Each structure stands twice: as structure tokens, then as C-alpha cells.
């Protein structure tokens, strides 16, 4: 675990240990890995999610 599926380059060369929700840039940022968040109906869940680990979007973002 640790390589963000949407991350590349320097991030995957020195991957996060928090799963697939890391945010890349100058470094790997795992501050949102433990929460579910939505962006234009594209959700990502972290370690606090249950089940399949997918999100439901809309008026509220939640894990399903």
C-alpha cells in the first residue's frame, strides 16, 4: 500500500503509507487519506471508509 493510483513521478518514487488518496505535488501529502471527499462527483475514500471503500456524492459525501 501507499502508492496513490492518481499519483506519479516523485510521489510514487517515495510513496505515502496511507493508501491511494494521497495528493501529489512537491511531495506526497496524506492529510486527506483518512477521509472521504468529493470533487465534481469524483469521490475518493481513505482508511476510515468501510465496505468497498467507494464514495457517494451529492449534497453530502459519504462512504458506502
Swiss-Prot record:
GO MF term set: metal ion binding
Binding site for Cu(+) 4: 36, 49, 55, 63
Binding residues annotated for Cu(+) 6, in chain numbering: 45, 57, 61, 63
Keywords: Acetylation, Cadmium, Copper, Metal-binding, Metal-thiolate cluster
Modified residues (N-acetylserine): 1
Chain residues that bind Cu(+) 3: 18, 22, 24, 33
InterPro entries found in the cross-reference section: Metalthion_mollusc
UniProt binding sites for Cu(+) 1: 7, 11, 24, 28
Residues reported in the UniProt entry to bind Cu(+) 5: 38, 43, 45, 49
Positions with a binding annotation for Cu(+) 2: 11, 16, 30, 33
Family: Belongs to the metallothionein superfamily. Type 2 family.
Role, per record: The metallothioneins are involved in the cellular sequestration of toxic metal ions and regulation of essential trace elements. This isoform binds exclusively copper.
UniProt domain comment: 14 cysteine residues are arranged in C-X-C groups. These are thought to be the metal-binding sites in other metallothioneins.
Full protein name: Copper-metallothionein
Species: Helix pomatia (Roman snail)
Lineage, highest ranks first: Eukaryota, Metazoa, Spiralia, Lophotrochozoa, Mollusca
Amino acid at each position: 500500500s501507499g502508492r496513490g493510483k492518481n499519483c506519479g513521478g516523485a510521489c510514487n518514487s517515495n510513496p505515502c503509507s496511507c493508501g491511494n488518496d494521497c495528493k501529489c505535488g512537491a511531495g506526497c501529502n496524506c492529510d486527506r487519506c483518512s477521509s472521504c471527499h468529493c470533487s465534481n462527483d469524483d469521490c475518493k475514500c481513505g482508511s476510515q471508509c468501510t465496505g468497498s471503500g467507494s464514495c457517494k456524492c451529492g449534497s453530502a459525501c459519504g462512504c458506502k
